[in-house]
């Protein structure tokens, strides 16, 4: 499972975690400039570690397995390694991992059969509100269930090579298909639950990977998921990736944001 490559030490505040392999949008393309204004780049000690989604001026949604002891984020970026006048840098004042996510699983070197990675969500409260512009815009939470067969767009920055840590400078996009959860349940030893989504291409070659964790999955124009975990190597035929099913968490997200405004 690829997110464990990135976070066995880093996830709980360690500082010596090795960089991940196989960590990229697979089979994707350069996103059209400023086409994903809700896309967030999450950093730890100046290193890009995860993606995220801007929900409003004060809050970013990402994956719970991206948990570290301090964060900073960039909003409105297209190029990971270049300065962009329109991009905005923010520190994070506090993080709120979903209380139902089992953090202890991140310390394991292998995934035990039946492991449950449900609730892989975390909210980040920005230390200063984002300025809403043409290139920095929030995206709304879903109001209806996603439908299998929908065309989905995932995005993120990550390695463009399979065996060494060479990140893409350009934000990458990839079109994948939302599949019935049974397609994932058949090929994963871990639990596949109703708070997860299964998406990819059964023929392989198009996928998200560890560097994309926490980034958006937009199906038929609606934010429906965030990247959670998937096969290693990424894009493996017959093995779609797993995303968090956001409509199952609307209440928790809204309540957490309201109580910690």
Curated annotation (Swiss-Prot):
Q: Which reaction does it catalyse?
A: Preferential cleavage of Arg-|-Xaa bonds in small molecule substrates. Highly selective action to release kallidin (lysyl-bradykinin) from kininogen involves hydrolysis of Met-|-Xaa or Leu-|-Xaa
EC class of the enzyme, as a word:
hydrolase
According to its UniProt entry, the function of this protein is described as: Glandular kallikreins cleave Met-Lys and Arg-Ser bonds in kininogen to release Lys-bradykinin.
What family is this?
Belongs to the peptidase S1 family. Kallikrein subfamily.
Q: Which residues are glycosylated?
A: 102
* Prodomain positions: 19-24
Q: Where is the Peptidase S1 domain?
A: 25-258
| Any single biological process term in GO | zymogen activation
* Name of the protein in its database record: Kallikrein 1-related peptidase b26
Species of the source: Mus musculus (Mouse)
């Amino acid at each position: 499972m690829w997110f464990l490559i990135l976070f066995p030490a880093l996830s709980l505040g360690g500082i010596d975690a090795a960089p991940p392999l196989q960590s990229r949008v697979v089979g994707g393309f350069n996103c059209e400039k400023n086409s994903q204004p809700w896309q967030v780049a999450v950093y730890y000690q100046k290193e890009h570690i995860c993606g995220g989604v801007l929900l409003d001026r004060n809050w970013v949604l990402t994956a719970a397995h991206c948990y570290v002891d301090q964060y900073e984020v960039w909003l409105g970026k297209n190029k990971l390694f270049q300065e962009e006048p329109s991009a905005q840098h923010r520190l994070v004042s506090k993080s709120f991992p979903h209380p139902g996510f089992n953090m202890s699983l991140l310390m394991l070197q292998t995934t035990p059969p039946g492991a449950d990675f449900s609730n892989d969500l975390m909210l980040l409260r920005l230390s200063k509100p984002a300025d809403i512009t043409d290139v920095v815009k929030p995206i709304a939470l879903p109001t209806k269930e996603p439908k299998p067969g929908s065309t989905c767009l995932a995005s993120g920055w990550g390695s463009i090579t399979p065996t060494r840590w060479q990140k893409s400078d350009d934000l990458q996009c990839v079109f994948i298909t939302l599949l019935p959860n049974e397609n994932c349940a058949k090929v994963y030893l871990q639990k596949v639950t109703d708070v997860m989504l299964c998406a990819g291409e059964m023929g392989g070659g198009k996928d998200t990977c560890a560097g994309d964790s926490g980034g958006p999955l937009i199906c038929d124009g609606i934010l429906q998921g965030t990247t959670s975990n998937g096969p290693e190597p990424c894009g493996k035929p017959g093995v779609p990736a797993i995303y968090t099913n956001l409509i199952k968490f609307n209440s928790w997200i809204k309540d957490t944001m309201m109580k910690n405004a």
